[in-house]
Amino acid sequence: MKATIILLLLAQVSWAGPFQQRGLFDFMLEDEASGIGPEVPDDRDFEPSLGPVCPFRCQCHLRVVQCSDLGLDKVPKDLPPDTTLLDLQNNKITEIKDGDFKNLKNLHALILVNNKISKVSPGAFTPLVKLERLYLSKNQLKELPEKMPKTLQELRAHENEITKVRKVTFNGLNQMIVIELGTNPLKSSGIENGAFQGMKKLSYIRIADTNITSIPQGLPPSLTELHLDGNKISRVDAASLKGLNNLAKLGLSFNSISAVDNGSLANTPHLRELHLDNNKLTRVPGGLAEHKYIQVVYLHNNNISVVGSSDFCPPGHNTKKASYSGVSLFSNPVQYWEIQPSTFRCVYVRSAIQLGNYK
């Protein structure tokens, strides 16, 4: 049984929608394929000892300390110094204080999901010089913690009370790859321009189900996935996507978008998936026919009444354009018999096209 648990811990992560924490090792089953895998600790990092004492009521095994679901109101004392994963989720902790994690210089993952944390002392995470994953979701934070470890690769803080994202918060976090800030009362004015810009390895941002009305400015060119679903964005202009040359997936479903300005998609030359379903679009966004790599376009549940024969595919048979594997246009006013058959001439599998079912 123990061997099975450790194998789960060391499994490669995968992504499948918003992060849902349900147990100790579910933190490895993460959104949308970040590609981050936990490092196997090198036994040479630790000196032989008789073994530290496990905190009361917690479970300790192979440098994993599980103290979840115990009703704790503070971080346990005397945590084993060789701990690499500390699970404190589903407790009643209200504050993270300086010294709570002292001597945990080998900690790689810290799970604080579903507590009542409203305050984190500025130096609380300073001793964690090897921390790569920090999970703070489902708490009561109004701002992100200060002075997070420079080794951090993944930060998840959805379902808090965060209203501000400051640029200084991410200063020096050059190893960051994944940031999840969904389901917070964030407004566009609360995100400083260029707040994410300095993180040169950042590839995934999710700010879904908030109150932002525009795409954040100054996003890093390293981004490959941007998920802004369930917000109050009304328009996509060319400037908002400028410089996102590596973006492969853009999620803008369930907003109030009525227009995508001409030239916007040209700023994302490697885009493969575009999710614009459940918005207020009246026409197919311009630039799809010229886009070389795009393969999936979701436009269902909009107000599109006309689809032109050149909206999706270039003239003739342009072999340089990737074939679509998914185009959804159902639940729009346009009738399927009003669409010319040649409209989807660059779609080689007809089952990839979804039409009809408009009420």
From Swiss-Prot:
InterPro entries: Leu-rich_rpt (IPR001611), Leu-rich_rpt_typical-subtyp (IPR003591), LRR_dom_sf (IPR032675), LRRNT (IPR000372), SLRP (IPR050333), SLRP_I_decor/aspor/byglycan (IPR016352). The keyword Nucleus does not apply. One of its GO terms (cellular component) is extracellular space. Disulfide bonds join 54-60, 58-67, 313-346. One of its GO terms (molecular function) is extracellular matrix binding. Residues 1-16 form the signal peptide. Its main location: secreted. Pfam families: LRR_8 (PF13855), LRRNT (PF01462). It is found in: Secreted, Extracellular space, Extracellular matrix; Secreted. It comes from the Eukaryota. Glycans are attached at residues 34, 211, 262, 303. Detected in placenta (at protein level). Detected in cerebrospinal fluid, fibroblasts and urine (at protein level). GO terms for biological process: animal organ morphogenesis; negative regulation of angiogenesis; negative regulation of endothelial cell migration; negative regulation of vascular endothelial growth factor signaling pathway; positive regulation of autophagy; positive regulation of macroautophagy; positive regulation of mitochondrial depolarization; positive regulation of mitochondrial fission. SMART domains: LRR_BAC, LRR_TYP, LRRNT. PROSITE patterns: LRR (PS51450). Belongs to the small leucine-rich proteoglycan (SLRP) family. SLRP class I subfamily. This is Decorin. The lineage of its organism: Eukaryota, Metazoa, Chordata, Craniata, Vertebrata. The gene is DCN.
